[in-house]
């Protein structure tokens, strides 16, 4: 049963607690030292940083040339270089302009424009339109011509963007634009320039298929539609044997129609090194291997950018084509400096402006939140200040839109709350957008909005995930699909997908593709063990990594405009029904100035809503979250025991390890707990100093007395971004707006010039205000600079801390409802349904399997809200929709009396009936699971619409019952959950004989003792802040164990530790601080008869 691999000697003791602190938390860095090692496994900003030029030497060019036909990786598998790489190569080669002409979209336009602005390359915007009726990925060489359009200035861009959007929406589904050639003709209006294109262009295709006469007719049609002055014949040379002959024939057509000739490279990558990758990507697009697709794929070896000199040599017989390309590029070039649309005017009552209506709503809300003005002068003074800034920046409409969205949620009983820096605003609090009082919590409004900041404010609205679609559709309905769209999320190649697709392109079998991809680590994207993976697969996978694969939907970003969005960016259908999405991601939208709203789905809000409903339904208790006593000691005592499975934000192994050391006693302790276990505070070295001060081990000290007001709440340890701003105010006399400038200058997008100016301002202010010597100011400024990248927003932590308390309160007082609510809100949270159910059982909650006569479609409560019943939707093959139908039939026509009665009233397939039988859901008919399985086929095939006698026999022979182990295995197979057992309990006798300690007994083990533990692996984590340390969470029937694996131990047991569903581990206990961790030394395989799956996170 046990395959124990003892590979580590006892002499290799575990690291000391001090060493663990260093690994887990890093050290504070000195000013000017980079926050991250660029090559390490380190945290990354979610925002795309400003484009940084590579500083490559430029070769220049004596021949003027502009590339007018280039595809980037945003042609999705038809380009092997990013827009930035194309611009960099164009700059190196000295091109006078570069056109980006991706397929059917402007996906890379913003990145292209940003890079070009930095490198002083003139930009031409265009697209290659696929006029065929099939998707580009459906076959190796889809039929239908292409039309290459170049926009002549901003108006041409707007017209092109509109037509791209119209075609995508007319196609009715993602990836199948449907163009109307006549509509394109009319839309051009002299603002486009048409190139005859590559081999798929009208003229080239006609020449290949019908000879010169056909080519002449195709060119005549283009000229008739777009006029001779707006059409040019395109010549390319990719090394094909017929290139010269075709180019000569095409050039011969020009004089007859009075059109120009331009030379292009038809580039699909920046330089020749990407040629092999481009072919591999084309094969993936064709859904074939390189070998099988070779007959269809166009030659791409020469499809890279070239200098003017090289183009002049290639087209020495037609030099005017190179000159004309440069001239046309100059005429078409413009910067992407579009005027960003504003929000649409908000519909306000008669007699009001947006400013006056916002003031009216805010003052009404303030009276509810704060009482009359005389009772809260500070609050009303702050509100007046904020309203003045909002009016000055012309943002009242933004706040009215957000208020309208939250009003819709409240009116439709949908839980929502604003979070992030919006919680710094008293206006947002008065409007009911946020639940945090910024005045009482002394939060700085300027962290959210100030006259010195660029762009609109950023308000994130968390919405219960199961109801978010209603809110999104409300926005579409209110503002119109032409004026509202979701922001895209560009799905890029990561390690596993890169290896799988490149192995496929090279013709390896699906099984081999899968096996090699699984060798790639979840955490680094690198192959942990490259043995057996061919070098060519690794080489191509490395090249394609981080290139775009396809377009997805951002988790919640929506853009609303006062004009059709397609005037700025094309819109297309998403895979999800009734969702239209921009072709740009959130960073693109921000760069252009589009106003974005984040409507984010939060599973815990759904779970809290379900818990409220279940408690009301089964216990008759109406819970008002806003009225819960946030000082209730029992809640904090439970959290201090790290009894937090399922509790929002504090259920991870890192949070569980911190809770017993922090010992939360008041609400603000939860705010700190939420903020502590984050990449910023961890990398900044704030975690353990705070805890030592919190527990009285270290004294609370300040570099200067002026720091005390800002840092008093966190015991002198900086945790929050707002504290950096407050320190600038208190120490150096900065205004709040100046303090926000300092925070931003020191942040992830550091500005050397701004930092130099503000540094001088800080020193001068502190000398003048406090007479502080320079050595003290040096130390304070150094700490600010080191901390700037790490601070967590206090407003964000405050918003989340409320949800921590609410969820912990339900876990403490209504554990059955809490468990059922979490199961109903899946997928969400840190733990699997199996672990949630096991934790509920450890808290005395009885959990029952699904039953066709007792279960709802989802998990619910029974026995006055003290027990949990699993839902029918959790049964394999059923799903929520069929489960709802089954429950509706039972509700309408009474309980099912037998299996034949069930299958006659609800249409079920044989696999579905068998899954119900396996889950024990048919036990209400007096049948054992084996008997129900035997009868499943006959019942499912013996419906009233079948002729009698053609189904299976309904006779059930005498069958033995299932053992407890078999029942547990059946439960897990059918629902993923064993309601009344845990897999390890069936091995307990053998484990006891081996000296394996149950999880619940680890608390009595002395610090430093070695133990043998075993359990199912629930999680594997390698945080970016842990410098290679991997954490494994083991669970047995008594509880959970946090296991720490040093890089050496992980390397020695890599395959076992990475893949085994259950492990036997010998290691050393560390529990001196009250948080129990086992530092692994040896690992062995534990074979479970009942299946278990882990959730592995980065």
From Swiss-Prot:
Catalytic activity, reaction form: DNA(n) + a 2'-deoxyribonucleoside 5'-triphosphate = DNA(n+1) + diphosphate
Region feature Disordered, mapped onto this chain: 34-57
Enzyme class: transferase
Gene Ontology BP annotations: DNA repair; DNA replication; error-prone translesion synthesis; response to antibiotic
EC number, as in UniProt: 2.7.7.7
Recorded GO CC terms: cytoplasm; peptidoglycan-based cell wall; plasma membrane
Domain of life: Bacteria
Localization (cell): Cytoplasm
Pfam families: DNA_pol3_alpha, DNA_pol3_finger, HHH_6, PHP, tRNA_anti-codon
Xref: NCBIfam families: polc, PRK05672.1
Family: Belongs to the DNA polymerase type-C family. DnaE2 subfamily.
Name assigned to this protein: Error-prone DNA polymerase
Organism, as annotated: Mycobacterium tuberculosis (strain ATCC 25618 / H37Rv)
């Amino acid at each position: 049963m046990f395959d124990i691999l003892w590979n580590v000697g006892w002499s290799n003791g575990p690291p000391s607690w001090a060493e663990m602190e260093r690994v887990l938390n890093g050290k504070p860095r000195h000013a000017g030292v980079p926050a991250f090692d660029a090559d390490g496994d380190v945290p990354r900003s979610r925002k795309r940083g400003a484009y940084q030029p590579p500083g490559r030497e430029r070769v220049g060019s004596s021949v003027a040339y502009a590339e007018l036909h280039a595809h980037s990786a945003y042609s999705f598998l038809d380009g092997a270089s990013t827009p930035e790489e194309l611009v960099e190569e164009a700059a190196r080669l000295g091109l006078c302009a570069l056109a980006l002409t991706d397929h059917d979209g402007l996906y890379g336009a913003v990145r292209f424009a940003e890079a070009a602005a930095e490198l002083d390359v003139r930009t031409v915007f265009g697209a290659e339109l696929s006029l065929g009726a099939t998707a580009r990925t459906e076959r190796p060489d889809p039929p239908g011509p292409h039309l290459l359009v170049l926009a002549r200035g901003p108006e041409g861009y707007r017209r092109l963007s509109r037509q791209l959007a119209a075609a995508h929406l007319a196609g009715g589904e993602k990836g199948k634009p449907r163009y109307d050639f006549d509509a394109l003709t009319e839309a051009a209006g002299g603002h486009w320039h048409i190139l005859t294109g590559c081999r798929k262009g009208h003229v080239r295709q006609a020449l290949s298929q019908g000879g010169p006469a056909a080519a002449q007719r195709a060119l005549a049609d283009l000229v008739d539609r777009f006029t001779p002055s707006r059409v040019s014949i395109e010549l390319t040379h990719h090394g094909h044997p017929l290139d010269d002959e075709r180019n000569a024939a095409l050039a011969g057509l020009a004089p007859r129609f009075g059109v120009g000739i331009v030379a292009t490279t038809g580039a699909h990558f920046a330089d020749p090194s990407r040629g092999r990758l481009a072919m591999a990507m084309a094969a993936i697009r064709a859904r074939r291997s390189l070998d099988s697709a070779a007959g269809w794929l166009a030659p791409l070896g020469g499809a890279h950018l070239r200098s003017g000199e090289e183009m002049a040599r290639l087209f020495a017989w037609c030099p005017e084509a190179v000159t004309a390309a440069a001239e046309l590029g100059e005429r078409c070039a413009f910067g992407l400096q579009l005027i960003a649309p504003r929000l649409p005017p908000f519909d306000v009552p008669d007699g009001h402006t947006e400013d006056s209506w916002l003031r009216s709503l805010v003052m009404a809300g303030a009276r509810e939140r704060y009482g009359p003005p005389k009772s809260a002068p500070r609050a009303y003074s702050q509100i007046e200040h904020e309203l003045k800034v909002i009016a000055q920046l012309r943002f009242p409409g933004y706040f009215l839109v957000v208020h309208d969205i939250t009003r819709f949620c409240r009116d439709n009983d949908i839980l929502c709350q604003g979070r992030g820096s919006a919680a710094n605003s008293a206006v947002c609090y008065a409007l009911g957008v946020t639940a945090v009082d910024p005045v009482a919590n002394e939060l700085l409004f300027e962290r959210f909005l100030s006259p010195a900041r660029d762009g609109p404010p950023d308000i994130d609205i968390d919405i219960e995930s199961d109801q978010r679609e209603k809110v999104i559709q409300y926005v579409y309905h209110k503002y119109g699909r032409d004026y509202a769209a979701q922001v895209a999320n560009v799905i890029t190649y990561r390690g596993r997908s890169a290896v799988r697709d490149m192995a496929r392109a090279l013709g390896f079998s699906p099984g081999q593709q899968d096996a090699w991809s699984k060798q790639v680590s979840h955490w680094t994207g690198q192959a942990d063990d490259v043995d057996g993976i061919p070098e060519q697969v690794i080489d191509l996978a490395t090249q394609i990594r981080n290139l775009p694969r396809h377009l997805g939907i951002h988790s919640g970003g929506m853009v609303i405009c006062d004009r059709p969005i397609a005037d700025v960016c094309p819109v297309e259908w998403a895979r999800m029904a009734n969702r239209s999405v921009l072709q740009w991601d959130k960073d693109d939208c921000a760069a252009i100035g589009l106003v974005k709203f984040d409507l984010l789905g939060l599973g815990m809000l759904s779970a809290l809503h379900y818990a409220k409903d279940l408690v009301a339904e089964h216990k008759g208790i109406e819970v008002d979250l806003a009225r819960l006593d946030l000082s209730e000691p029992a809640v904090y005592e439970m959290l201090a025991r790290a009894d937090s499975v399922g509790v929002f934000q504090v259920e991870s192994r890192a949070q569980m390890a911190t809770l017993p050391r922090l010992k939360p006693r008041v609400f603000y302790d939860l705010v700190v707990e939420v903020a502590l276990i984050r990449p910023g505070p961890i990398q900044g070295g704030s975690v353990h100093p705070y805890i030592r001060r919190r527990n009285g081990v270290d004294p609370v000290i300040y570099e200067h007395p002026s720091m005390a007001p800002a840092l008093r709440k966190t015991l002198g340890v900086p945790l929050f971004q707002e504290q950096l701003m407050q320190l600038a105010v208190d120490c150096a006399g900065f205004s709040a707006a100046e303090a926000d400038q300092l925070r931003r200058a020191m942040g992830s997008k550091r500005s050397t010039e701004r930092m130099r100016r503000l540094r001088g301002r800080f020193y001068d202010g502190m000398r003048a205000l406090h007479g502080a010597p320079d050595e003290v100011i040096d130390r304070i400024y150094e700490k600010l600079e080191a901390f700037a990248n790490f601070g967590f927003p206090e407003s964000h932590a405050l918003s989340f801390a409320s949800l921590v308390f609410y969820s912990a309160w339900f876990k403490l007082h209504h554990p059955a409802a809490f468990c059922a609510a979490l199961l109903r809100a899946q997928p969400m949270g840190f733990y699997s349904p199996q672990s949630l159910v096991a934790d509920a059982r450890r808290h005395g909650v009885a959990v029952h399997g699904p039953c066709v006569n007792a279960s709802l479609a989802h998990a619910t409560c029974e026995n006055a809200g003290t027990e949990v019943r699993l839902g029918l939707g959790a049964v394999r093959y059923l799903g929520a929709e069929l489960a709802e139908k089954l429950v509706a039939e039972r509700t309408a026509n009474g309980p099912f009396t037998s299996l034949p009665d069930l299958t006659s009233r609800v249409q079920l397939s044989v696999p579905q009936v068998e899954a119900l039988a396996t889950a024990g859901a048919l036990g209400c008919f007096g049948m054992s699971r084996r008997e129900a399985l035997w009868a499943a086929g006959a019942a499912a095939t013996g419906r009233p619409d079948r002729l009698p006698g053609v189904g299976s026999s309904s006779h059930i022979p005498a069958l033995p019952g299932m053992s407890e182990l078999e029942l547990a295995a059946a439960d897990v197979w059918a629902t993923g959950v064993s309601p009344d057992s845990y897999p390890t309990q069936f091995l307990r006798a053998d484990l006891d004989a081996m000296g394996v300690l149950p999880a619940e007994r680890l608390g009595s083990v002395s610090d430093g003792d070695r133990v043998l533990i075993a359990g199912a692996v629930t999680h594997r984590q390698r945080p970016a802040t842990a410098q290679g340390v991997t954490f494994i969470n083991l669970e047995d029937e008594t509880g959970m164990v946090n296991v720490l694996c040093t890089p050496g131990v992980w390397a020695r047991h890599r395959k076992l530790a990475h893949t085994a569903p259950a492990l036997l581990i010998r290691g050393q206990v560390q529990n001196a601080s009250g948080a129990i961790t086992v530092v692994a030394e040896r690992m062995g395989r534990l074979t479970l008869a009942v299946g278990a799956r882990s959730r592995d996170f980065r």
